[in-house]
């Protein structure tokens, strides 16, 4: 309980810094997702993940894998592009995947480059 009080009433400098950093990461992810044909995404406003619609890539065959939905796509991306993300199916949103940006800019750059290449 004491930690909660300190978190709420103590210095808030780090909160502003982290908010700015997550906004920077969010903006970067949105910019990179916009470069990928067949992917659309509304900007997240209160979370540290993006939820892009990737349904235009369903019914495609990518590197020998037929993509039937978000689970197939997530498995393909994990196996072929070494990208870990969450299929939208887990949230009742089959047309989407969830991508966290609670990681380093370097990891985001690498992952988004791999995503773009895998869906090309």
Language-model segments: residues:
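PLP-dependent class I/II
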Residues: 1-120
């Amino acid at each position: 309980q004491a930690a909660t009080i300190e978190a709420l009433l103590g210095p808030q400098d780090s909160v502003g810094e982290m908010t700015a950093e997550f906004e920077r990461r969010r903006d970067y992810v949105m910019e990179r997702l916009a470069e990928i044909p067949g992917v659309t995404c509304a900007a997240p406003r209160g979370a540290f993940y993006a939820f892009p619609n990737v349904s235009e890539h369903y019914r495609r065959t990518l590197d020998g894998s037929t993509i039937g939905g978000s689970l197939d796509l997530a498995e393909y991306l994990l196996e072929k592009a070494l990208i870990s993300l969450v299929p939208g199916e887990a949230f009742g949103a089959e047309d989407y995947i969830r991508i966290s940006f609670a990681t380093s800019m370097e990891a985001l750059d690498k992952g988004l480059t791999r995503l773009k290449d895998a869906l090309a």
